[in-house]
């Protein structure tokens, strides 16, 4: 018997519908970010890598390779103006030809020097108007690309008490976003992301899930909260936030990454895999369709394509563990008030080696049993480095 045979026999003995679990794994759609394939770094410096993509088209090529190896990374999220081209339709056609589709479109309201005091919260109405124009432009770009979501993260905030009026900033933001939301076509949703701090260090205008949720309620039904795993204070119970937003039908999606201290953008599941498992327990347990699953990471010292492949595999395995949780036993333990029995149900699933299950799902999709090993054995990194040139 194979490892997969042994695992499925054990799981079926526990009452797990293995076929349904594998079908759910095959149906995963994970968006990888175009910006995650290019040069990135910290405020201390950037370490260029040989073979780094020089254009958005090469970033799409890298995303297509991740999808080929993993089978479930069939969407690529884009960032504008980072991914701007002269002909948006040409980019759309290239993405389709690569076997991908466009995920969320991410506007950039944090790099232009005009936004030093904020974008849609800026005291200057001319700068707010400039920010709105970019947001409206991204809606049209998304329409051409076939994207169904705008993913908004605002860096807006203040560094010192007294710098600006906190409530007036909030009202400026809602006023601008209301106009932008009104221009949103029916096929697009608005994902509103929050972050506790950075680059603002005194007050961030969208600092937590509550402030983001309140803005979404002001905007409309197609405005939902996007949860970035690294945008919380230390020790925050992210899975509880997920469960509340999902129950309110306001969970729009995720930016998956991992953290040790702040917004570290490490490989998802690398530092705290149990947290990732618990998040998927809430998602799978809700019984509804999964929200948008996007990776948002900054690979500063690691090989970028390999890091992205590992990230997708970690998400697949976390989802697989959540799918084999004995829900009946969990509910029974809860009803009986048996604290540790319920905890043990989750530990049983978490400690199960689900890699054969994930590999079987990938195999059915024509992907690799072991994507990281397959990538390393392929020699692609060396070929691409030779084609694209040295980093220096």
Where does each model-flagged region fall?
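Catalytic domains of carbohydrate-active enzymes, especially glycoside hydrolases
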Residues: 23-32, 36, 49-82
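N-terminal small/glycine-rich loop or linker at the start of catalytic domains
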Residues: 27-47, 108-122, 154-160
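Conserved beta-strand positions in the central sheet of alpha/beta enzyme cores
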Residues: 75-77, 104, 151, 255
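Active-site beta-loop-alpha junctions enriched in small/polar residues
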Residues: 35-37, 79-83, 107-112, 155-157, ...
């Amino acid at each position: 018997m194979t490892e997969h045979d042994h695992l499925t026999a054990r799981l079926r003995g526990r009452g797990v519908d293995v076929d349904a679990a594998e079908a759910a794994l095959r149906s995963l759609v994970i968006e990888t970010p175009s910006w995650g394939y290019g040069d990135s770094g910290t405020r201390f410096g950037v370490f260029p890598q040989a073979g780094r993509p020089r254009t958005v088209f090469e970033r799409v090529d890298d995303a297509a390779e991740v999808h080929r190896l993993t089978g479930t990374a069939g969407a690529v999220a884009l960032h504008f103006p980072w991914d701007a081209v002269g002909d948006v339709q040409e980019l759309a056609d290239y993405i389709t030809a690569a076997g991908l589709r466009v995920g969320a479109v991410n506007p950039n309201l944090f790099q232009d020097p005009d936004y030093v005091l904020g974008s849609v919260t800026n005291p200057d109405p001319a700068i707010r108007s400039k920010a709105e124009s970019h947001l409206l432009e991204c809606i049209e770009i998304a329409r051409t690309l076939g994207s169904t979501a705008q993913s908004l993260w605002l860096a807006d905030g203040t560094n010192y008490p007294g710098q600006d009026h906190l409530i007036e900033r909030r009202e400026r933001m809602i006023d601008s976003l209301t106009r932008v939301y009104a221009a949103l076509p029916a096929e697009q949703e608005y994902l509103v992301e929050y972050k506790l701090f950075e680059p603002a260090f005194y007050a961030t205008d969208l600092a937590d899930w509550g402030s983001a949720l309140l803005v979404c309620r002001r905007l409309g039904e197609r405005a939902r909260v996007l949860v970035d795993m690294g945008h919380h204070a230390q020790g925050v119970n992210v899975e509880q936030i997920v469960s509340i937003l999902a129950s309110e039908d306001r969970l729009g999606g995720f930016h998956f990454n991992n953290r040790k201290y702040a917004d570290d953008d490490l490989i998802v599941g690398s530092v705290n895999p149990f947290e990732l498992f618990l998040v998927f327990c809430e998602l799978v347990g809700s019984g509804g369709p999964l929200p948008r699953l996007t990776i948002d990471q900054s690979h500063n010292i690691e090989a970028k394509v390999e890091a992205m492949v590992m990230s997708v595999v970690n998400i697949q395995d976390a989802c697989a563990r959540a799918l084999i949780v004995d829900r009946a036993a969990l509910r029974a333990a809860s009803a009986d008030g048996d604290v540790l029995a319920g905890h043990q149900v989750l530990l049983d699933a978490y400690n199960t080696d689900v890699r054969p299950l994930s590999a079987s799902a990938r195999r059915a999709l024509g992907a690799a049993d072991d994507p990281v090993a397959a990538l390393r054995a392929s020699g692609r990194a060396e070929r691409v480095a030779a084609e694209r040139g040295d980093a220096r």
